[in-house]
Amino acid sequence: MNSYLLFKSLHLIAVVSWMAGLLYLPRIFVYHVENREKKEATDIFEVMEKKLFYYIMRPAMILTWIFGLVLIYLNGIEIFYQLWMQIKIVLVILLSAYNDYLGKCLVSLKNNSNTRSSKFFRIINEVPTIILIFIVFLVIFKPI
């Protein structure tokens, strides 16, 4: 089996898993905020948020980085010096920072110290989609 294709497949699986979490967690936050007066509901949302973040998103993010770096190595380090790849890496760093920010939001919701509205979480829910669009076009077309 071609090791490059194996790692590319593993990278894509990790990316899809991570993106699913990045898109779903803020939506759970919306429901959590809108139901903050209902203890039974918030208890359920807290379990969902915790499991999604710690058991799916964090491992998927780490695997995305590991397999992505392996692909850079297998392609030859020269690929790292191509502008499209540098922009992609910056965008993945932004997604990682966004992931960490969602982790902070998770903690603030758990501690009942959240000051953000459901509208805020609806808006930031679009951030990973926009970044993903740019990454996909960079990887497919390598325009620069």
Please place each PLM-identified region on the residue numbering.
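Polytopic transmembrane helical bundles with strong interfacial aromatic enrichment
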Residues: 1-144
